[in-house]
Swiss-Prot record:
This is Ribulose bisphosphate carboxylase large chain. The gene is rbcL. Its main location: plastid. One of its GO terms (molecular function) is monooxygenase activity. The lineage of its organism: Eukaryota, Viridiplantae, Streptophyta, Embryophyta, Tracheophyta. Binds 1 Mg(2+) ion per subunit. The modification N6,N6,N6-trimethyllysine is found at residue 14. PROSITE patterns: RUBISCO_LARGE (PS00157). The keyword Oxidoreductase applies. Its EC number is 4.1.1.39. It comes from Actinidia chinensis (Kiwi). The disulfide bond which can form in the large chain dimeric partners within the hexadecamer appears to be associated with oxidative stress and protein turnover. Its cofactor is Mg(2+). SUPFAM superfamilies: RuBisCo, C-terminal domain (SSF51649), RuBisCO, large subunit, small (N-terminal) domain (SSF54966).
C-alpha cells in the first residue's frame, strides 16, 4: 500500500489514510494467556511489505478500517485492537509469510463460534492488498474454552453408552446415497448392523427428498436398529441426519429421533452452520443423544494451500461448537489426508493438551481443559486391506467407516459387514499380541481370511484397488 499524507481536520484529529503497520504491527508485544492467537499464511500483492500485509490482517479482522475515523477517540484502541506480533517466511515460498496475530478476548462473544469466525475470517479474506490468505491455526485460550459446552458427551461417555471398549468402532455409509426408498434403506441398515457393524450412516446429502422423506427413513431405520440389537446382543446405531433448511425443522427431526429411542443423530456442520450446530449439540447433551458430524463442504474452504482455512481450524471449531464424531480423512483411502498433518488435527480432536509441533502443522500449544474429546471418523475409499493401517494409524478411539467397502461385497451387505468385523478383530488381536501391523498387516488379514469365507471374498475383490495420488495437504 502506498503511503498517503495525513490531513489536519478542524474536528481535532488527523484525518486521512495511514499505513496499518504504524498501529497494528507490534513486534515487541508479549502475548497474554487470554489472547486468541492466529497464524495466517499471507501472500501480499507485489510491492506490499510483509509487515504492512500482516498489520492489515490484524486491523481488518479487529478494530481497523481503511481510514482514520474520529470515533477512535471514544474508545481504547490499545485495549481492543488485534496485533501482528511476529512474521516469519514460509520455507520454499519466496512470496509467502506466516503472520501471527493476537486478539484480545473481549472482542469475542462467549460461547459463539459464529462470532469468532465472523471477526477473524469474516471480512479480511477479500482484502485487495493480499493476493491470498489462509488461516493455518488458532490458539483458543482456556478462558474462552470454558464458555463452550463442547461435544454433547465425548469419547468416554460414548463408550459407556455403547458398552464397547478396546477397539475402533465400525461404521458404514448406506449406498447408493440417493434414490433408495425408506424401506429398502432400512433393510440395508439392518443387514449391515446384523453383520457386525456398530453404526450405519445417512450420507451427508440425505435429508428429506421426494424419494425418501425423513420421517419414513427414521422409522424404518429405528426398526432396523432394534431388530439388529435384539439378535446380536450389541448396542447399535444409525446416524440419522437431522440437517434441514431451518433450525426449527432440524430440531423437529432431532426430537423425533429421541422419541424413537435411537442413540445418535447427525448434522452437516459447515453447510448447516455453526449456530445450528451448537443449538443441536446442546439439545443432544440435554437429551442423551450422541451427535455425529459430517464436514460436507470442507474442501471448498481448506483444499487450497495458500488460501482459505486449514481443516485443523475447522476441527477446533467443531470441538467448541459440539460433536461426538467428525470425519477426518483416512490417510490411506480416496479422500485427502497426509499422515502427520492428519494425526496432528486428530490429536487436537481427542486429547486434552496438545504441544506445539510444527512438523505436524500445530502452530500453538492447545489446552482444552475439561472440554470432551471427539472421535475422528476415517471414511472414503477404504476396504479390508486397509484395516491394519487404519487400526495402527488411528488407534482405538476412532470410527472406521466402510461404505462401498461393506456394500460392495460380492455376497451382499451382511457378508460385507462380517468381513470388516473379522478383519478388525484380527488386527486388534494381533496388535494386542505385540505384532507390527504396519509390517505384518497383509499377513494378518490373509490368515484371518482362512477361517472367514466372507473376508476371503472381500480380499479377492479389492486386492488391486489403490488410490495413489499426491496429497495436497502438505506443510
Amino acid at each position: 500500500m502506498s503511503p498517503q499524507t495525513e490531513t489536519k481536520a478542524s474536528v481535532g484529529f488527523k484525518a486521512g489514510v495511514k499505513d496499518y503497520k504504524l498501529t497494528y504491527y507490534t513486534p515487541d508485544y508479549e502475548t497474554k494467556d487470554t489472547d486468541i492467537l492466529a497464524a495466517f499464511r499471507v501472500t501480499p500483492q507485489p510491492g506490499v511489505p510483509p509487515e504492512e500485509a500482516g498489520a492489515a490482517v490484524a486491523a481488518e479482522s479487529s478494530t481497523g478500517t481503511w481510514t482514520t475515523v474520529w470515533t477512535d477517540g471514544l474508545t481504547s484502541l490499545d485495549r481492543y485492537k488485534g496485533r501482528c506480533y511476529h512474521i516469519e517466511p514460509v520455507a520454499g515460498e519466496e512470496t509467502q509469510f506466516i503472520a501471527y496475530v493476537a486478539y484480545p478476548l473481549d472482542l469475542f462473544e462467549e460461547g459463539s463460534v459464529t462470532n469468532m469466525f465472523t471477526s477473524i475470517v469474516g471480512n479480511v479474506f477479500g482484502f485487495k492488498a493480499l493476493r491470498a490468505l489462509r488461516l493455518e491455526d488458532l490458539r483458543i485460550p482456556v478462558a474462552y474454552c470454558k464458555t463452550f459446552q463442547g461435544p454433547p458427551h465425548g469419547i468416554q461417555v460414548e463408550r459407556d453408552k455403547l458398552n464397547k471398549y478396546g477397539r475402533p468402532l465400525l461404521g458404514c455409509t448406506i449406498k447408493p446415497k440417493l434414490g433408495l426408498s425408506a424401506k429398502n434403506y432400512g433393510r440395508a441398515v439392518y443387514e449391515c448392523l446384523r453383520g457386525g457393524l456398530d453404526f450405519t450412516k445417512d450420507d451427508e446429502n440425505v435429508n428429506s427428498q421426494p424419494f425418501m422423506r425423513w420421517r419414513d427413513r427414521f422409522l424404518f431405520c429405528a426398526e432396523a436398529i432394534f431388530k439388529a440389537q435384539s439378535e446380536t446382543g450389541e448396542i447399535k446405531g444409525h446416524y440419522l441426519n437431522a440437517t434441514a433448511g431451518t433450525c426449527e425443522e432440524m430440531m423437529k427431526r432431532a426430537v423425533f429421533a429421541r422419541e424413537l429411542g435411537v442413540p445418535i443423530v447427525m448434522h452437516d456442520y459447515l453447510t448447516g452452520g455453526f449456530t445450528a450446530n451448537t443449538t443441536l449439540a446442546h439439545y443432544c447433551r440435554d437429551n442423551g443423544l450422541l451427535l455425529h458430524i459430517h464436514r460436507a463442504m470442507h474442501a471448498v474452504i481448506d483444499r487450497q494451500k495458500n488460501h482459505g482455512m486449514h481443516f485443523r481450524v475447522l476441527a477446533k471449531a467443531l470441538r467448541m461448537s459440539g460433536g461426538d464424531h467428525i470425519h477426518a480423512g483416512t490417510v490411506v483411502g480416496k479422500l485427502e489426508g497426509e499422515r502427520d498433518i492428519t494425526l496432528g488435527f486428530v490429536d487436537l480432536l481427542r486429547d486434552d493438551y496438545i504441544e506445539k509441533d510444527r512438523a505436524r502443522g500445530i502452530y500453538f500449544t492447545q489446552d482444552w481443559v475439561s472440554l470432551p474429546g471427539v472421535l475422528p471418523v476415517a471414511s472414503g475409499g477404504i476396504h479390508v486391506w486397509h484395516m491394519p493401517a487404519l487400526t495402527e494409524i488411528f488407534g482405538d478411539d476412532s470410527v472406521l467407516q466402510f461404505g462401498g467397502g461393506t456394500l460392495g461385497h460380492p455376497w451382499g451387505n451382511a457378508p460385507g459387514a462380517v468381513a470388516n468385523r473379522v478383519a478388525l478383530e484380527a488386527c486388534v488381536q494381533a496388535r494386542n499380541e505385540g505384532r507390527d501391523l504396519a509390517r505384518e498387516g497383509n499377513e494378518i488379514i490373509r490368515n484371518a481370511s482362512k477361517w472367514s469365507p466372507e473376508l476371503a471374498a472381500a480380499c479377492e475383490v479389492w486386492k488391486e484397488i489403490k488410490f495413489e495420488f499426491q496429497a495436497m495437504d502438505t506443510l
